[in-house]
Amino acid sequence: MAGIESVLQETRVFNPPESFVKQANIAGMDAYRALCAEAEHDYEGFWARLAHEHLLWHKPFSKVLDESNAPFYKWFEDGELNASYNCLERNLENGNADKVAIIFETDDGKVSRTTYRELHARVCRFANGLKALGIKKGDRVVIYMPMSVEGIVAMQACARIGATHSVVFGGFSAKSLQERIVDVGAVALITADEQMRGGKALPLKAIADEALAMEGTDAVKHVIVYRRTNGNVNWVEGRDRAMDEVEAGQPDTCEVTPVSAEHPLFILYTSGSTGKPKGVQHSTGGYLLWALLTMQWTFDLKPDDIFWCTADIGWVTGHSYIAYGPLAAGATQVVFEGVPTYPNAGRFWDMIQRHKVNTFYTAPTAIRSLIKAAEADEKVHPKQYDLSSLRLLGTVGEPINPEAWMWYHTNIGGGRCPIVDTFWQTETGGHMMTPLPGATPLVPGSCTLPLPGIMAAVVDETGHDVPNGQGGILVVKRPWPSMIRTIWGDPERFKKSYFPEELGGKLYLAGDGSIRDKDTGYFTIMGRIDDVLNVSGHRMGTMEIESALVANPIVAEAAVVGRPDDMTGEAICAFVVLKRSRPDGDEAKQIANELRNWVGKEIGPIAKPKDIRFGDNLPKTRSGKIMRRLLRSLAKGEDITQDTSTLENPAILDQLKETR
């Protein structure tokens, strides 16, 4: 791995606008370096100061970091606090009670607003209802819900009473839901009758019933149902209750349950893992601290900002930057039930215009699909909308290709909005590397530098640092407060997955390849380690080849995987979506040849894809991530045996098979 080659050079640099720097929470690189120096000089003192300043403690902590049982690190362990108190009471006490916390827009465009006072009352009523059912501190509650105020209420109510929640994305199958219910040992399930996406009703309660009919789910004594559509659903007497009935008659106040800073706030299962699902366990204190700090640092949050993260609460982004971070920071945020292409592909831009959104945070995949839509239909091009309220853009979920970055910067940000290209993971709890919008000069496609206190590095297979300009394995050298605590019920797997002995057992393995710029030290993520290609002895990250393909003016989106090849060891297989309709026959061969030559010119002959297939789109999860493991199977000509329950567009698999 030490020899991953970087073959794509990016020379464009965009400095933060002076007007942005003047009012930034971290203004200029000197301010960033001062925070980094504070952390370098006194690591525990740095984190202790931030935890004292930014969190409300019921019992102050006396010990900052306990490394005695590494890698099972503990932060602020003897301190006690409550996450819901830090998100809700904090705002009632500091003058935000009548500030709008959530602007919620349904799939079909209905808008409602919930103030902090109203949200607090709803969370308290539901928390009281949970307690009345006998749910208590330490119990695990699975939440299988649509994007909704009710989903956030359910999470906050669990936190309020010390119950650990495990949110399962509403696109998962009954089997996936059952596996998670069993693994986490849930005593209750909170779901909805149906969820609305793109004008279609999807039967959540029916899927939940199917999951609960499978073995191992007997511990679930209560099923609470949010009536989203009032659809006709099966009802089990004594087990099933409507959410509004659980709240009915309960008082608007609910004493919080203080918990240790190390108490598990939630367990979130990582998507795409093979075999037994991997439950990532997060703490309360360290996790909440970082969710709040990154709202202020990365998103430069201001009191009057309208913040919009387009993620789903079923993923970590929806935990940190919808359910917890914005509320702890006292923000007003947009929460959206639907999809970016319904009723048309101008939905996001229309919502930014109507709600006067200031900060917009979305996935590169969404951006790429909306680029294609804008090229195909002038009516949904962002230039048709007033996006002047925007001051900051962000990307999350995967690296963004430089050309998609440029389109986002020009067409959505009007050339004036910094872009925070955030690198982080379910396991890290919050941002790890990202530009700071009022400080960091931006380079398209680079997540730039680690946040203060994050000791990231690039190493070889033995755990030794590699020089800037040479690719290697991305690691973090010191524990940080919001990191994963363990894999639920499987500490050995946790150690092997994240602190492998091959790297000395002390370095956190991110699982990504990375390279640092020779001059600036900026990090670029080169894709997952298992996405590294080895063609005739040359090791290349898939990200660079994808970026080269997307730089071609006819290409909307591309994903690159490897497949075994007798001659070169591994051959490059590219799946490409054009900005126009999908070609076939001789035309497909001709365009494939043009794209091969294009990549050869952009990178070099060694990077030319052997196999190029064209699709109307790519297989993606509903959160917008490309399902590369499915593409690897398609490239090899294998039957698809993996779980495809989160796949947004299953028909695409047959299309991509046929284009071989």
From Swiss-Prot:
Its cofactor is Mg(2+). It comes from the Bacteria. The modification N6-acetyllysine is found at K625. SUPFAM superfamilies: Acetyl-CoA synthetase-like. Keywords: Acetylation, ATP-binding, Ligase, Magnesium, Metal-binding, Nucleotide-binding. CoA binds at R197, G198, G199, K200, T317, S536. It holds the Pfam family ACAS_N. InterPro entries: Ac_CoA_lig, ACAS_N, AMP-bd_C, AMP-bd_C_sf, AMP-binding_CS, AMP-dep_synth/lig_dom, ANL_N_sf. One of its GO terms (cellular component) is cytosol. It catalyses: acetate + ATP + CoA = acetyl-CoA + AMP + diphosphate. Belongs to the ATP-dependent AMP-binding enzyme family. PANTHER family: ACETYL-COENZYME A SYNTHETASE (PTHR24095), ACETYL-COENZYME A SYNTHETASE 1 (PTHR24095:SF14). This is Acetyl-coenzyme A synthetase.
